């Protein structure tokens, strides 16, 4: 998500709000952007929120008018299947939170909704791939009332959580 945020920031948007459950990720993205690009005229803010939370719902109700919503959230590692508690969280994040943000986007008149998926959704052999495949089915169903696009990505070299990223650290 940081690379996407930087690309959007460089285009001087009127409003760029970034939501991530990790406060540390938000601090890092702001530091990186400020040191690389400085400031924009638009409204750039970060929010350390869980999309599944009541606080996120209040945030959307307070300022939920967005032309574009990019949902880049995911529990994307097969190791997240190791216990039933993390597995339940994976289903919440990958399926139910996606459905929630699509519904909120449709209700608020969002022009375009984008959601990232994985190559593992093509022919799922594990719960992570299956959860993303189910998410894609929700995307297809919701596309009747919301302009939606999605892309399947394989593991991206040096992305957060990848093996190559750990070497870079």
Predicted regions and their residues:
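NAD(P)H-binding glycine-rich loop region in Rossmannoid oxidoreductase-like domains
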Residues: 7-13, 17-18, 34, 40, ...
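Residues at the starts of beta-strands that form the adenosine-phosphate
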Residues: 14-16, 43, 111-112, 147
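Hydrophobic/aromatic anchor residues within beta-strands of the central parallel beta-sheet
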Residues: 46, 90, 113, 148-151
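Conserved Rossmann-fold NAD(P)-dependent oxidoreductase catalytic core, especially the SDR/UDP-sugar
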Residues: 71, 75-133, 141-142
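A short helix-to-beta-strand connector/capping loop
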Residues: 38-45, 144-146
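NAD(P)-dependent short-chain dehydrogenase/reductase
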Residues: 106, 127-169
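Helix N-cap at the beta1-alpha1 junction of Rossmann-like dinucleotide-binding domains, i.e.
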Residues: 21-25
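Residues forming the Rossmann-fold NAD(P)(H) cofactor-binding site
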Residues: 2, 6
């Amino acid at each position: 998500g940081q690379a996407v945020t930087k690309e959007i920031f460089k285009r001087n948007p009127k409003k760029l709000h970034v939501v991530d459950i990790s406060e540390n990720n938000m601090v890092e993205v702001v530091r990186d952007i400020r040191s690389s690009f400085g400031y924009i005229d638009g409204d750039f803010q970060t929010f350390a929120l869980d999309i599944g939370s009541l606080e996120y719902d209040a945030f959307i109700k307070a300022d939920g008018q967005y032309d574009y919503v990019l949902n880049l959230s995911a529990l994307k590692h097969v190791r997240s299947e190791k216990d039933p508690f993390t597995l339940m969280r994976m289903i919440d994040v990958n399926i139910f939170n996606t459905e929630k943000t699509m519904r909120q986007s449709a209700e608020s008149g969002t022009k375009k909704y984008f959601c990232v998926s994985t190559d593992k959704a093509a022919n799922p052999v594990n719960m992570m791939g299956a959860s993303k495949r189910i998410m894609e089915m929700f995307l297809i169903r919701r596309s009747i009332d919301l302009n939606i696009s999605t892309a399947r990505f394989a593991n991206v070299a040096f992305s957060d959580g990848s093996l190559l990223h750990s070497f870079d650290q």
